[in-house]
Amino acid sequence: MSRWKRRFLILGLSIVVLAVFLLIAGFEGIPFLVDLWWFSAQDYGFYFWQRALYQLVVFIQVSIVFFLIFFVNFWVASHYLGSERPADIPPGAPRKKFKNLFFRFQTGSLWIYTPLSLVLSIIIAWPLFQQWESFLLYLVAPDMGIQDPAYGKNISYYLFSFPIYVLILQRLLISFLLLLASLTLFYWIENRLLSQHGKRLPTGAKWHLSILVLMVFFIEIWDFFLQRNGLVYSEAHQPLFSGPGFVEMRVILPFIWLSMFFLLGIAFFLLLFIHKRKGLKTLAVFSLLFILSLGARHFHFLHWATQEYIVKPNELSIQKPFIENSIKATLDAYKLSNVEVRKFERKKALKNIFNAKVQDLLHNVPVWDKELVGQVYRQLQQLRTYYGFPAENVDRYMINGKKQQVFLGARELNYDKLPSGAQKWVNEHLLYTHGYGLAMSSAGQGQGEASMDWFIRGIPPESDEGFNIKQPGIYYGRGSYRYAIAPNENREFDYPKGNANVMTDYQGKGGVSLSSLFEKYIFSVYFQDKDIFFTTQTYDKSKILFRRNIIERIETLTPYLLLDAAPYLVATTEGLYWIQDAYTASTWYPNADVLGLMRFEFPIPPKGSEKINYIRNSVKIVVDAYHGTVNYYIFDSSDPIIQAYSRIYPGLFKPKEQMPEDIRAHIRYPKDLFEIQMGIYAKYHQTDLEIFYQQEDMWTFAQKYNRESETRLRPYYLTLDLIEENRLDFLLFLPMIVKGQDNMRAMLVAGSDDPYYGKLIAYSFPKGELVFGPAQINAVINEDPKVSAQFTLWNQDDSKVVLGDMIIMPVDQVILYIQPVFLTIKDDVRIPKLERIIISDGRSVVMEPTLMEAYAKLKERIETEGAEGESH
């Protein structure tokens, strides 16, 4: 080949290599750089490098371990292969090709088995790399202080160590089986070659294979040991209880121990036979015993016979300790061990509930449904098509010196609602960059428009109650936000004012600098949008704001946290903030009942698994709606998982005491967690063993009824004095009914205010006492002739009767049932009208335009009828 052709070839190859490098850099380097800038802009640059370094360290360490496993074995094998030089073999001999391979393997440690070991180590260990964070948790796992009753191991072993051991075992077993198979083949070929010259395989080769065999046996013995520990996750006794029972601990466990013993014997006598040609019969006996023990362990008939003829006739007494272990573990795993059980003794004299205290409580009753509130907000407070209210939430604020329960929603930007002709790049990314303000109304029935009292309304926000928010701009929220470039030469639309628009320039901390051509190039490639690079509307203070959906924002920062489905808005004098509840969860808590999140339609989205058996609301996250800053606060310091993460990432999670007071005043117990806990407590409140075994006091969620359908009643917030008498607390409340029946069995309460945040109380009714549930009250309402006639009359017109969520409200030792009645126009999107309020004590039913009128009417009826005694 001529010189110029050679140079041309080298140049061409160089260009190809450079192109491939740039392509890889484009796919990997640009996202890495963008992430680095994004994390750094939020003061999480050190945290970003921490995570990157941790991944690199785990990658290197795991790779080194498996590299050494392969490298050392290949290096040892190289000393026993290639005893003949290829030159000593006549050309064309059949074994010539094998000797070439073996000779290169023997003499080429750097060029043959070094890269081979590296490639194999990465392939085998790749699942371990993907679990790099689990490795870190394993290394820093705290002592939980609770022991598993089956084996006496700390619970932290099961949460952190056991899953990693299972994964490591699998990869080690694959590695040594691969080595054993490949080197056995090589040594067998070498032995055949040597035997043609009357030679034998070196003793060292036999010992090498023996060590590999021994390692495989030891790994298998470890596997059996982990299977022994894994019995604590048995679901064989569901639906009665979780964890091991008599069959597992008295039948399966002994066979596991026998299998381990026989496997150890097989390993010993196999090595003895290989090296001494002795012990073959004993080896055969141990092998047969191992097969028998393994078969007996998995022989379903043996398990069935034990269960059917030993356990079943004496199940309660035999399974007693295992059931008790399961009850305790399940209550601990879902943080239900400290639920306070109180008896709810109802008053017999109903007329005693008509007093000033009850009247004050009724003013805070949330008669508006969340879904219907959303319709009202969109109709009355959206004001422009490009605004929207993605969700409304319930909270409490001090208004006129009293704790007032309210609805509030953020007026967020909804760019998709702009006319199609206005959906231009400049409008999308430079002009319409943010939402503005909020609306707040009373949760109870009001006197204003749509039967609501508005505490904050309009654009800009107006308030007769003195609410003043310095920065109402919403650049980060629950909506689907595009990237925005702000500030910019074009200026940003802030809010409409009459026939004009008020403009603004973003002054917040959020966003990544977009002042240089290099930065514009990087982001134009990242977003695949050339207009970022070519726009002339940026200047030295311009920044690009992205990942503005708060859930996406948090998941990018802390993907290991499980997020609640409903972040909620908090308004302070400084600005608007989002509070996002976050959970740590696991499927590895021993003996605890497993909850299928998807099967029960619970709203927390599981990551990687549809099941959990441990959960804690360990962290509350605050996101500034204007600046986009994200702060993490620990609200359950007893959780070992969040303790471990705090050790891995020091400084990331702050103690709850550091949360600003004006934000901390609005924390609340999360509905998602409460619903999950109560789904478990419905069964596991039966701590009496006989009652639990008979399942005679199983609870379930009550149903809510419309005139056309029924769905599960979700928890709702009330402001009552159910924790401490004469002290109003913001509570999460859920009535539970008897499974298979409609009567109410208990009322479950979770505190949201300090010092009772997280306090769980179960108010139970005596078993022999009939307390109506929502279905029975719904039947009582439908049977009332006046109510039924009025419903029929309304439905004959163009209107449609919609029943809101029934509020079951315990006040002054009496149960009141409050049923809002709404009217909507059929096939119309007009504002739903709160037409009537129905109130009942379980026997009498009254329906009036307002709650207070209905309350007065109920009083009148009870006094007229002389109704004293126990309500039904």
Curated annotation (Swiss-Prot):
It is a multi-pass membrane protein. Coiled coil: none annotated. The keyword Transmembrane applies. Keywords: Cell membrane, Membrane, Transmembrane, Transmembrane helix. The chain crosses the membrane at residues 8-28, 56-76, 109-129, 159-179, 207-227, 254-274, 282-302. InterPro entries: UPF0182. It comes from the Bacteria. PANTHER family: UPF0182 PROTEIN SLL1060. This is UPF0182 protein Noc_0961. It comes from Nitrosococcus oceani (strain ATCC 19707 / BCRC 17464 / JCM 30415 / NCIMB 11848 / C-107). The lineage of its organism: Bacteria, Pseudomonadati, Pseudomonadota, Gammaproteobacteria, Chromatiales.
